[in-house]
């Protein structure tokens, strides 16, 4: 299992690597963080995957009043995600959930199992389980596997360091937002407030700006 242990040291992204990401629902709920990750996937700088339970959780939460979305708009978002990334949906991970009994929060066992299934599906490739809740999906739960739970800001920062094109992709992304318009400075402030401060700083530097956290 030396390879598994080695995968959890050093940078999260290697030069020339297209990281394999399994996304927890909580990183798909914030509009702009979701846009950042999915635009990078569309540019083939990362590969994204999720499970049916993850999408169900996204749907359930986006219908809460604080997100200001209608059932129709949520359905369209999920339909667009499925259409844009037809290979992202991972099925058949339920049998792996018992492996995480007592290791993760019971409600997040399906996320852990999905990430492990993804690693095995790709012949033991490292998988970054991108989550905003490391406490419920601790690294210890994935000992002797090639799955590493990481916060979104950490993987985005390392990806930018290895792939300067990240800055160009996100610059182009901003052109889609019109009502309201979102400037570079706006996005940096949003990322900073979304626990992605180090990434916001690095992205601001790439754009020749300073993030709001500096």
Regions found by a protein language model. Name each.
Residues 1-35:
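Metal-dependent nucleic-acid phosphoesterase active-site entry motif
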Residues 20, 31-33, 37-67:
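PIN/NYN-family metal-dependent endoribonuclease catalytic core
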Residues 52-93, 172-210:
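PIN-domain endoribonuclease scaffold, especially VapC-family toxins
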Residues 93-99:
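Short linear capping/connector segments at secondary-structure termini
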Residues 20, 128-129:
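Hydrophobic "anchor" residues on beta-strands that sit immediately upstream
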Residues 105-125:
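Acidic, metal-associated active-site segment
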Residues 124-128, 134-214:
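Acidic, PIN/NYN-like endoribonuclease modules and their adjacent C-terminal/linker elements
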Residues 26-27, 53, 135, 154:
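Alpha-helix/helix-capping structural signal
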